[in-house]
């Protein structure tokens, strides 16, 4: 796996088409995945590649509502390309960080924001992507490990969202305990 910083020269047409086909509307074109963040004070996006094929995306940006950064925005890993079966495969894949989000997206966002920065993630109960699983399973399990904490509910970008704060040091400490997906 390889994380590549997004830039205008990347050919993501196949990725966008596959995201559209799978119903990931926020990752189905540059306008919805990238351009909507260009008005943020600071932002960056990355594409995850496996064998030179784009298989995932993530964005981080300033989050003035919380005086920090919002990470894991536009997170997408296309089904059928990861070794596990995703969030629904079991508690172990989450708490032992045996998923691409934990092993690639979160560390990349931490590196960009700075390990001591205030970093937040938002989740909701919408059907989009795997939001319900993220909201009901992923973050609550990581909260029990002290890696995230539920902060509050806000209306953000016209959607009711739960804000989770990342404890970057604890997350990285726990991540180092487990093997990396190759």
Regions found by a protein language model. Give the residues of each.
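Conserved acetyl-CoA-binding loop-helix of GNAT-fold acetyltransferases
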Residues: 77, 83-109, 132, 136
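Conserved catalytic-core motifs of GNAT/GCN5-like acyltransferases
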Residues: 122, 140-163
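Glycine-rich phosphate/pyrophosphate-binding loop shared by adenosine-nucleotide-utilizing enzymes
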Residues: 52-57, 70
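Active-site rim helix/loop that mediates acceptor-substrate recognition in acyltransferases
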Residues: 23-49
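Short amphipathic alpha-helix that is part of the acyltransferase structural core
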Residues: 1-32
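Conserved acetyl-CoA binding element of GNAT-fold acetyltransferases
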Residues: 67-80
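Conserved beta-strand-loop-alpha-helix junction that forms the acyl-donor binding cleft
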Residues: 110-135
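Conserved N-terminal entry element of GNAT/NAT acetyltransferase domains
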Residues: 1-10, 170-182
């Amino acid at each position: 796996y390889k994380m590549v910083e997004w830039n205008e020269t990347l050919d993501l047409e196949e990725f966008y088409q596959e995201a559209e086909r799978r119903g990931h509307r926020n990752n189905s074109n540059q306008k919805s995945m990238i351009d909507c963040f260009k008005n943020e004070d600071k932002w960056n996006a990355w594409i995850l590649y496996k064998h030179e094929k784009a298989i995932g995306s993530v964005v981080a940006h300033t989050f003035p509502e919380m005086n920090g950064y919002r990470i894991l925005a536009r997170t997408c890993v296309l089904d059928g390309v990861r070794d596990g079966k995703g969030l629904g495969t079991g508690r172990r894949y989450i708490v032992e960080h045996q998923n691409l989000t934990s092993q690639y997206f979160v560390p990349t966002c931490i590196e960009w924001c700075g390990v001591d920065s205030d970093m937040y993630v938002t989740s909701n109960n919408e059907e989009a992507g795997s939001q319900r699983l993220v909201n009901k399973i992923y973050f609550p399990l990581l909260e029990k490990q002290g890696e995230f904490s539920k902060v509050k509910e806000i209306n953000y970008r016209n959607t009711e969202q739960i804000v989770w704060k990342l404890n970057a040091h604890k997350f990285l400490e726990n991540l180092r305990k487990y093997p990396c997906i190759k």
